[in-house]
Amino acid sequence: MIALIDYKAGNLNSVAKAFEKIGAINFIAKNPKDLQKADKLLLPGVGSFKEAMKNLKELGFIEALKEQVLVQKKPILGICLGMQLFLERGYEGGVCEGLGFIEGEVVKFEEDLNLKIPHMGWNELEILKQDPLYQGINNKSDFYFVHSFYVKCKDEFVSAKAQYGHKFVASLQKDRIFATQFHPEKSQNLGLKLLENFARL
């Protein structure tokens, strides 16, 4: 059973509907105790890094997530801002500490690259390592992105990259911690396939 974490910073309905389409049982986790009932966790997210961390702290999710992910070793999937929160720090609205599951930081796309920010739309993935989420998904497949910030971390944690002005991290994997900068729930059949792969872990 997959817990969709409700910390007032994500569109849970679209993710829940996507899991329903593939027959994966899920529920909305509104408090830290709910995480104990799940065998997998999903952290969605839209909006500001700093505001999201503030919400997680106020709702008591930070220590609960660290217990479930780092000690209990439950698989977790972070989507978009959810992925960024897995890093050590972000700079949106000032320096802010993240969950620290993966070493690295979150920075904004450089405005001098003549890019439209946010990066919004379909983009091709370069899959770099065997990540169970990409089972049955071909390299160079397109997924849907909406973001102004991107992750900088060690290559060993990067499972896919995409190109927007320069190459950036499209997904991460470290042990049973998985994350996508793109939105699988908005990425049609391939997105559903990726969510199905996560549900089957």
From Swiss-Prot:
Give the main localization category.
Answer: cytoplasm
Question: Which keywords label this protein?
Answer: Amino-acid biosynthesis, Cytoplasm, Glutamine amidotransferase, Histidine biosynthesis, Hydrolase, Lyase
What compartments host this protein? Cytoplasm
This enzyme's EC code(s): 4.3.2.10, 3.5.1.2
Active-site residue list: C80, H183, E185
Catalyses: 5-[(5-phospho-1-deoxy-D-ribulos-1-ylimino)methylamino]-1-(5-phospho-beta-D-ribosyl)imidazole-4-carboxamide + L-glutamine = D-erythro-1-(imidazol-4-yl)glycerol 3-phosphate + 5-amino-1-(5-phospho-beta-D-ribosyl)imidazole-4-carboxamide + L-glutamate + H(+); L-glutamine + H2O = L-glutamate + NH4(+)
**Which residues are in the Glutamine amidotransferase type-1 domain?**
1-201
The Gene Ontology biological process annotation of the record reads: L-histidine biosynthetic process
The UniProt GO MF terms for this protein read: glutaminase activity; imidazoleglycerol-phosphate synthase activity; lyase activity
Q: Pathway, per Swiss-Prot/TrEMBL?
A: Amino-acid biosynthesis; L-histidine biosynthesis; L-histidine from 5-phospho-alpha-D-ribose 1-diphosphate: step 5/9
Read off the InterPro entries from this record. Answer: Class_I_gatase-like, GATASE, Imidazole-glycPsynth_HisH
Pfam families, per database record: GATase
Provide GO CC annotations from the record.
cytoplasm
* UniProt entry tagged with the keyword Ribosomal protein: no
User: What is the purpose of this protein?
Assistant: IGPS catalyzes the conversion of PRFAR and glutamine to IGP, AICAR and glutamate. The HisH subunit provides the glutamine amidotransferase activity that produces the ammonia necessary to HisF for the synthesis of IGP and AICAR.
The family database entries (PANTHER family) matched by this protein are listed as: IMIDAZOLE GLYCEROL PHOSPHATE SYNTHASE SUBUNIT HISH (PTHR42701:SF1)
Assembly description = Heterodimer of HisH and HisF.
Name the HAMAP family on file: HisH (MF_00278)
**Protein name per Swiss-Prot or TrEMBL:** Imidazole glycerol phosphate synthase subunit HisH 1
Q: Which organism is it from?
A: Campylobacter jejuni subsp. jejuni serotype O:23/36 (strain 81-176)
Encoded by which gene? hisH1
